[in-house]
């Protein structure tokens, strides 16, 4: 008989969250005592908006670089299939507030100063779908998200600065 599992993100009531926000999903502890933290980086309101793939793809590539420039320990930042945000996996303990500030700073850079030459992994050799990028869309979404502010609480708006 298959093992019964609960996938936390499918237990979250997506109708009561208030995006954009950063939410600590879990802290996992390894056998040697090491800690991995998993965050829900929700950029748009579930079931009301979705970032089209080209813009999301470009944001993904930029966050892979920009987050690592701002904090050590990033393992991965992968988009949700629903296209409303990302899972951010980190080594060590981190707060939602600190991660929200890092995401805000990264989106500010995307919105204001990133050029096409700054986007990593946009060649046929470095990306599995290199034609599906849009810096224009990434900048537009970054501006829209920043206008709302990123909260460190998924249920009550508490925008970090």
Swiss-Prot record:
Disulfide bonds: none
Subunit structure of this chain's protein: Homodimer.
Record GO terms (molecular function): iron ion binding; S-ribosylhomocysteine lyase activity
EC id: 4.4.1.21
Protein name: S-ribosylhomocysteine lyase
The protein's role, per its UniProt record: Involved in the synthesis of autoinducer 2 (AI-2) which is secreted by bacteria and is used to communicate both the cell density and the metabolic potential of the environment. The regulation of gene expression in response to changes in cell density is called quorum sensing. Catalyzes the transformation of S-ribosylhomocysteine (RHC) to homocysteine (HC) and 4,5-dihydroxy-2,3-pentadione (DPD).
Keyword Lyase part of the UniProt annotation: yes
Cofactor note (record): Binds 1 Fe cation per subunit.
Entry keyword set: Autoinducer synthesis, Iron, Lyase, Metal-binding, Quorum sensing
Enzyme class: lyase
SUPFAM superfamilies: LuxS/MPP-like metallohydrolase
NCBIfam families referenced in this protein's UniProt entry, alphabetically: PRK02260.2-5 (NF002607), PRK02260.3-1 (NF002608)
InterPro entries found in the cross-reference section: LuxS_sf, Metalloenz_LuxS/M16, S-ribosylhomocysteinase
Family statement: Belongs to the LuxS family.
Species classification: Bacteria, Bacillati, Bacillota, Bacilli, Lactobacillales
Domain of life: Bacteria
């Amino acid at each position: 008989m298959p093992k019964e599992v609960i996938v936390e993100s499918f237990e979250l009531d997506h109708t009561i969250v208030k995006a954009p926000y950063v939410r600590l999903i879990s802290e996992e502890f390894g056998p040697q005592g090491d800690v991995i933290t998993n965050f829900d980086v929700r950029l748009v309101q579930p079931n009301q908006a979705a970032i089209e793939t080209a813009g999301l793809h470009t944001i993904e590539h930029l966050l892979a670089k920009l987050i690592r420039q701002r904090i050590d320990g990033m393992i991965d930042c992968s988009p949700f299939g629903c296209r409303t945000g990302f899972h951010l996996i980190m080594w060590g303990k981190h707060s939602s507030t600190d991660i929200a500030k890092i995401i805000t700073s990264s989106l500010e850079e995307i919105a204001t100063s990133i050029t096409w030459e700054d986007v990593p992994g946009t060649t046929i050799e470095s990306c599995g779908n290199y034609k599906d990028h849009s810096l224009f869309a990434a900048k537009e979404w970054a501006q829209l998200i920043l206008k709302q502010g990123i909260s460190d609480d998924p249920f009550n708006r508490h925008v970090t600065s």
